[in-house]
C-alpha cells in the first residue's frame, strides 16, 4: 500500500490511484483485499464519513467563533494563529501520515490519528489561555492530516477501483457539507452555548467514528516495512522541523512587527532571518533526500505541477483571507451576533461550493480547464476589491452580492489545478503530484491568514491615532473583536469602528494581491484539453 492523499470528489482519476498506480487490469481487480460483510462495511463507511466531516469542520467552524475568543482571552493579536496553527501542521504532516500507513497496521494508525484529533479538541475546548488554544489547534491539525490521508486509503483497500469514486465522492460531499455548515454551527454554539463547544462537539462524534473503526474494520498488517533507521529516513523528520520552524518564525515576525515590537527591532529581524535560513535549508534538504523528501524534486521540475501549486497557494490565500475576516467585520463593525455572522457568510460559502461542483462537471465534459483559472482568479480579485468598499453601514444587498461575486471567482478556479495535474501526469505519479499540490496549497492558508492579520493590526493601530485620538490603543486590543460597543467609551466608539473598517480593508488588499498574483500565475499553464491528454507533461 502506498501513500494515500486527499482529493476533491470530482477528481476520479486520483481517487482511483490513492494507493499508487497498478500495472495491469488483473492487479486492479485484486485491490480490494479486505473483505467485510455488508453491514460492517456500511458502519466503517459511516465512521470514515464522520471523521472526514469533523476534520473538515475544523477548517471552518472557528471562523465565526474567533471574535468571541479574542474577547475572552484579550488576544486580538493572535487571530492569525487560530487558523495558521491548524493549517501548518495539517500541511506538514500529511506526507508523514501517508508513509506511516505503509509502515504500520492501517487500523491502528488510523485510530492514532483520531486520538490526536480528539486530544487537540479537548485542549482547545478546555484552553485556559490563547496559547493553549493555539497548541490545541496545532495538535488537531496533526490528527486531521491523518484522517484525510487514512480515510481515502481505507476506501482503497475495501473496494475495487471501479467503485472507489462513488464512495470517495460521499466523503467529498461530507467535506463540502462541513464547509457550508461550519460557520453556522460555530456561530450557533458561540452565541447560544459557548465557543468551546466548537471543539467539544468533536468528542462524541469522533468517539462514534473511533468505535465503528475499532469494532468493524479488520486489522491489516503492513506487507513490508523498513527497519527503524529506514523509517526515520523516509519520514523526513528534519524536513518537518524546518518547514514548521520557518513558518512559525514568519508568523511571529508578522505578529510582532509594528505592534508589540518595531519592524527594525532585533526580534523581528531575527525571526525573518531565521525564516529565510530555515526555508533555504528545507529546499536543500528536500533536494538531497530525493524520493524520500516531503516535496519530491521530480514533481517540482514539472511545469504543470509547480505552476499549479503556485496558483493553489495564491488562490487559497485569497479565499481564506476573506473567509476568516468577514465574521470579524460583521461582529465588530456591524455589531451582530456570532450566529448571525455565520448566516451572513453563507452567500460566500454557497457560491464557492456550487461553482466548484458545476465547473468540475463542465471541465469533465468539455476538457477545457485552463480558461477557468484565469476567469476565476480575475473574478476573485474583483470580488475582493468590491468587499474592500464595505463601511460601517453597508446594506445587505451590498454584502450579499459582493460575497457571491468573490465566491464565484474562488469556486470556478479552486479545483482546476488538481484536475490539470491529474490529467497531465502519469498514473504512477498522480498521488505524489496531488500530495505536493495540497501541501503547498494548505501552506498558502497559513501565509494568507497571518499576512492579513499583520496588515489588520498595523492599520488598526495607525488609524486609531487618527480617528480616536486620546484613546489608549491597548484598550482596543484587549477588548476583543465583538466587545467594542460594550467596552469602548461612547465618544470614541465611532472612531474605533472606522479604524476597524480600515484594518479590514487592509486585509482585503492582501486578498486582492494574492488574487491578482494567482491571475498572473494562471498564464504559466499550457492551453490543453485534458480529455485528450494521456501522457505526462514534458
Curated annotation (Swiss-Prot):
Keywords assigned: Cell membrane, Membrane, Transmembrane, Transmembrane helix, Transport
* Residue numbers spanned by region Disordered: 1-22
Per the record, membrane topology reads:
Multi-pass membrane protein
What does the function comment of this entry state?
MFS-type efflux pump involved in the modulation susceptibility to various compounds including the xenobiotics 2,3,5-triiodobenzoic acid (TIBA) and 2-chloro-5-hydroxypyridine (CHP), CuCl(2) several fungicides (clotrimazole, fludioxonil, vinclozolin, and iprodione), potassium superoxide KO(2), and the singlet oxygen-generating compound hematoporphyrin.
Q: State the disulfide connectivity.
A: none
Alphabetical list of Gene3D superfamilies matching this protein? MFS general substrate transporter like domains
Give this protein's Gene Ontology molecular function annotations. Answer: transmembrane transporter activity
Q: What induces it?
A: Expression is down-regulated in the presence of TIBA or CHP, and induced in the presence of H(2)O(2), clotrimazole, or vinclozolin. Expression is regulated by the stress-responsive transcription regulator Yap1 but not the Hog1 MAP kinase.
Entries under CDD domains matching the protein: MFS_Azr1_MDR_like
* Family the entry assigns: Belongs to the major facilitator superfamily.
Q: What is this protein called?
A: MFS-type transporter MFS54
Query: What InterPro entries does the annotation carry?
Result: MFS, MFS_dom, MFS_trans_sf
Q: For this UniProt entry, what is the primary localization, expressed as one broad class?
A: membrane
Which cellular compartments is it found in? Cell membrane
Q: What is the lineage of its organism?
A: Eukaryota, Fungi, Dikarya, Ascomycota, Pezizomycotina
Amino acid at each position: 500500500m502506498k501513500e494515500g492523499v486527499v482529493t476533491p470528489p470530482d477528481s476520479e482519476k486520483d481517487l482511483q490511484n490513492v494507493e499508487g498506480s497498478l500495472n495491469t487490469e488483473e492487479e486492479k481487480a485484486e485491490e480490494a483485499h479486505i473483505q467485510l460483510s455488508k453491514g460492517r462495511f456500511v458502519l466503517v463507511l459511516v465512521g470514515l464519513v464522520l471523521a472526514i466531516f469533523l476534520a473538515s469542520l475544523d477548517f471552518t467552524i472557528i471562523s465565526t467563533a474567533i471574535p468571541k475568543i479574542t474577547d475572552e482571552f484579550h488576544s486580538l493579536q493572535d487571530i492569525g494563529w487560530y487558523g495558521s496553527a491548524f493549517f501548518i501542521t495539517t500541511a506538514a504532516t500529511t506526507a508523514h501520515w501517508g508513509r506511516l500507513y505503509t509502515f504500520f497496521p492501517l487500523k491502528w494508525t488510523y485510530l492514532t490519528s483520531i486520538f490526536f484529533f480528539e486530544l487537540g479538541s479537548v485542549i482547545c475546548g478546555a484552553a485556559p489561555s490563547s496559547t493553549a488554544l493555539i497548541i490545541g489547534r496545532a495538535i488537531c491539525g496533526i490528527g486531521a492530516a491523518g484522517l484525510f490521508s487514512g480515510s481515502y486509503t481505507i476506501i482503497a483497500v475495501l473496494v475495487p477501483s471501479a467503485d472507489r469514486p462513488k464512495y470517495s465522492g460521499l466523503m467529498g460531499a461530507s467535506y463540502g457539507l462541513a464547509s457550508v455548515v461550519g460557520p453556522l454551527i460555530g456561530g450557533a454554539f458561540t452565541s447560544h452555548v459557548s465557543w468551546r463547544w466548537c471543539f467539544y462537539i468533536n468528542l462524541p462524534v469522533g468517539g462514534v467514528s473511533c468505535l465503528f473503526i475499532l469494532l468493524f474494520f479488520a486489522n491489516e498488517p503492513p506487507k513490508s516495512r523498513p527497519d527503524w533507521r529506514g523509517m526515520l529516513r523516509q519520514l523526513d523528520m528534519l524536513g518537518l522541523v524546518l518547514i514548521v520552524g520557518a513558518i512559525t518564525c514568519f508568523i511571529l515576525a508578522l505578529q510582532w512587527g509594528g505592534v508589540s515590537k518595531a519592524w527594525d527591532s532585533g526580534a523581528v529581524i531575527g525571526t525573518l532571518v531565521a525564516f529565510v535560513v530555515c526555508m533555504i535549508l528545507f529546499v536543500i534538504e528536500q533536494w538531497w533526500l530525493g524520493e524520500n523528501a516531503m516535496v519530491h524534486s521530480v514533481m517540482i521540475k514539472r511545469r504543470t505541477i509547480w505552476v499549479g501549486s503556485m496558483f493553489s497557494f495564491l488562490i487559497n490565500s485569497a479565499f481564506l483571507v476573506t473567509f476568516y475576516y468577514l465574521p470579524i467585520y460583521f461582529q465588530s463593525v456591524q455589531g451582530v451576533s456570532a450566529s448571525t455572522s455565520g448566516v451572513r457568510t453563507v452567500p460566500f460559502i454557497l457560491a464557492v461550493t456550487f461553482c466548484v461542483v458545476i465547473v468540475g462537471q463542465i471541465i469533465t465534459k468539455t476538457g477545457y480547464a485552463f480558461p477557468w483559472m484565469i476567469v476565476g482568479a480575475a473574478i476573485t480579485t474583483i470580488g475582493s476589491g468590491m468587499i474592500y468598499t464595505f463601511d460601517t453601514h453597508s446594506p445587505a444587498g451590498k454584502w450579499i452580492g459582493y460575497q457571491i461575486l468573490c465566491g464565484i471567482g474562488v469556486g470556478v478556479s479552486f479545483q482546476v489545478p488538481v484536475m490539470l495535474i491529474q490529467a497531465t501526469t502519469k498514473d504512477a505519479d498522480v498521488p505524489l503530484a496531488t500530495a505536493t499540490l495540497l501541501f503547498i496549497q494548505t501552506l498558502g492558508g497559513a501565509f494568507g491568514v497571518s499576512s492579513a492579520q499583520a496588515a489588520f493590526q498595523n492599520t488598526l493601530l495607525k488609524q486609531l491615532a487618527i480617528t480616536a485620538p486620546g484613546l489608549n490603543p491597548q484598550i482596543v486590543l484587549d477588548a476583543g473583536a465583538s466587545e467594542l460597543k460594550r467596552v469602548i467609551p461612547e465618544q470614541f466608539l465611532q472612531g474605533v469602528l472606522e479604524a476597524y473598517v480600515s484594518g479590514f480593508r487592509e486585509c482585503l488588499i492582501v486578498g486582492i494581491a494574492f488574487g491578482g498574483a494567482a491571475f498572473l500565475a494562471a498564464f504559466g499553464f499550457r492551453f490543453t484539453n485534458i480529455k485528450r491528454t494521456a501522457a505526462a507533461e514534458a
